[in-house]
Structures are given as structure tokens and as C-alpha cells.
């Protein structure tokens, strides 16, 4: 009798243990954070491209993508870490926070944080709002907002391309949103980000018009690069950023 009872008890415990660990596993999944953190400054890190170097062919060539990400973007990240070595308090902040509060950054390193922090934030967004087999017309809330603001997608593209073409030297063309969802087009020099000068101008789309972004394929034909770039815009990612802008 005791032997039978012992066997039943062992069988019962054997059934309960896997169930217990399964419940623990599920609770851990449910507790996982859903929001992506801002870019860390302790240390700053270069994430891999979300697609292959050749994935944006024929509009952006693989060699340009490799050099742009692995050399140019990597240099911005390395420079941030080198600059902040002597500033442990600043390492506790995100790179996003540093570039939006440049007046609080020590003057001795302010320009370096502006240039390299901006370069890191700008390029991180740039890789995310492009994708293979993307392009086409906008979708979702962004499509409606573009039509309401600019009249049509074609009119918007014309104004955006002009902002990129007219930017003398190096810089960026941007589509920004305020917290109410109002859109506007702007451009910045060098690696400046719109949030550096206007905390209510959240970038949801940006095109890099530095020569390193296009010169290997397009040489001095920036206008052609600007036109072809629309074939790789990831409108799903742009819509996500548009929603984020209104939650700021």
C-alpha cells in the first residue's frame, strides 16, 4: 500500500514541476519591456544593419552601405566613447538626451558631442527607415498627414527633394512632426538633428545628403540619388516614428 502511494506521489510531483517552470517562463515573457530604449552613451554601440549590405540595390550600392555603416557611422560611435571617457556623469545619459541638451554639455566637448552624437542618432534612424522591397506610396496615418499638409505625395516629394538638393555642402533633409502630428520639411547642416534647435520637431524621415551617402554610385548627381532614394523608404517604420512623435 505504501509503495503504491509513493508511486502516485512521485507521479504527481513529476507533473507539477514542468507546469511550475512553464508558468515562471510565461510570466517572464509577459514582463519583458515593449519599448526600445534610447541610444546608450555608456558605452555607445553600433548596431548591425537590419539587412544585408546589398539589400538596397540597385538604388544604394553595397560598397556604399558597407563604408557608410562600418566606417562612417562606426567613427561617430567611437568618437562618442572616446570623448566621454573623462565624463562619467554624462555616460549615464542617453545620446539622444545629450544632443537635445547641448547647452548642458561642457563647452570643451560640446562640438564633439554635437557632431558625433548627432551622427550616431541620425544614422541609427536612417538605417531603420529604409528597407529592401520597400518604397511606393506612403501608407497609414503618414499618408493622410502628407496629403493634408502638402496636397499630394508628389508635391511632398518635390519639396523634400528640393530641401536636400539646396542643402549646401553636407547635411540632411528631414520630415518632422510636432506633438500634435503637424508635419513640416526642414534641412540641417553637418550632423545636426532637428531636435537640437526645436524640441517639438521630431524627425520621422530623413535623407543623408553627405557625399559619402551616394558619391560612389551617383558621383555629383545628388538630384538623381534623391529621386531614387524613395524606392527604399520603409513607410511602416515612418508611421511608427510618426506615432512616437505624438507621444513625446
From Swiss-Prot:
Any one Gene Ontology cellular component term annotated for this protein: cytoplasm
Induction: Constitutively expressed.
Cofactor note: Binds 1 Mn(2+) ion per subunit.
Broad EC category: oxidoreductase
EC number(s) on file: 1.15.1.1
DNA damage in keyword set: no
Keywords for this protein: Manganese, Metal-binding, Oxidoreductase, Signal
N-terminal signal peptide: 1-41
Annotated Pfam families: Sod_Fe_C, Sod_Fe_N
Cofactor names: Mn(2+)
Protein origin, superkingdom: Bacteria
Reported function: Destroys superoxide anion radicals which are normally produced within the cells and which are toxic to biological systems.
Protein name as annotated: Superoxide dismutase [Mn] 1
Species this protein is from: Leptolyngbya boryana (Plectonema boryanum)
